[in-house]
Regions:
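Glycine- and acidic-residue-biased ligand/ion/polar-headgroup-sensing regions
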Residues: 84-103, 196-215
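Bacterial N-terminal signal peptides
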Residues: 22-31
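A short glycine-rich, His/Asp/Glu-containing loop-to-beta-strand
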Residues: 53-80, 85-92, 162-192, 197-201
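Short acidic-glycine-tyrosine-enriched beta hairpin
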Residues: 105-122, 217-234
Length: 259
């Protein structure tokens, strides 16, 4: 208390101009002081040292997962880098890949289409892992990296998503993820369904989409674009949801379920 009393006494002795300066200094210190509660995401993120934008962009972050977008241009190699594991990649824009491990070429000009997914184990920097774009167009990726390394017993049962009016194609299934592909043709709706579990929607082909909850519109004809993401987790277990394609182009997205 004595310290605060001295500060107040000194403040009252200041001239009007000096008081304004004092207040400005306090505001700057408050606004730009480091946030002790901010989360350090570096252990979940990739760094491609050869690229102009080596860190890409964090496009989503919550208590379960971090999503990072990276773009590799034609003829570019990412540069030697590590992977944290518990991670999948989704090709928003696919292309031709070549890869090296321990400085040796592992594969060359392998094609990955738009919407294709894969799993990344942990790779230490000592393995000298590197990948390059062997095609003529940029490759755009979104990495989904889990924060929690839970045991099988802690995960419980997680079910595949089903839609009444649309068939979902299972693209990937392991101990941490399901990944399903959804295609909505013009005028097509998913059908009312429960939204259970922890899921992320990642758009591959965009368009105009509408959404309903319990039969009532949440929004109508919202434009979505490739690479858009949405966290899907219902606040009420009894609510039904559905989305519909109200545009003229086919919409495609992948549904990532965290187990």
């Amino acid at each position: 208390m004595r310290r605060h009393g001295v500060l107040l006494e000194n403040y009252l002795k200041l001239s009007k101009q000096n008081k304004l300066t004092f207040i400005c200094i306090l505001l700057v210190n408050f606004l730009f002081a480091p946030n002790s509660n901010s989360e350090n995401l570096s252990k979940y993120l990739l760094n491609y040292p050869n690229l102009d934008d080596p860190d890409g962009e964090v496009i989503f972050n919550n208590e379960y997962a971090v999503l990072q977008r990276l773009v590799v241009g034609p003829g570019e190699w990412e540069g030697v880098h590590s992977h944290p594991g518990n991670q999948i990649y989704v090709h928003i824009k696919g292309g031709y890949w070549s890869g090296r491990m321990h400085g040796e070429l592992e594969y060359e000009k392998e094609f990955s289409p738009d919407g294709s997914v894969g799993w990344m184990d942990a790779i230490p920097i000592e393995d000298r892992h590197d990948s390059g774009n062997s095609g003529d167009n940029p490759i755009e990726l979104i990495y989904v990296t889990l924060k929690q390394d839970t045991s099988e017993e802690e995960r419980g049962d997680t079910e595949l998503q089903t839609y009444p009016y649309v068939n979902l194609e299972l693209l990937f299934d392991n101990h941490r993820f399901f990944v399903q592909k959804v295609i909505l043709n013009p005028g097509e709706w998913e059908g009312p369904h429960l939204q259970t579990g922890r899921r992320i929607s990642i758009v591959i082909k965009g368009g105009l989409i509408s959404s309903k909850r319990n039969g009532e519109y949440l929004f109508r004809e919202r434009e979505i674009s490739p690479g858009d993401v949405e966290w899907l987790e219902s606040e009420s277990p009894n609510d039904t949801f559905e989305r519909g394609n109200e545009g003229k182009e086919t919409i495609e997205y992948v549904l990532v379920t965290i187990k």
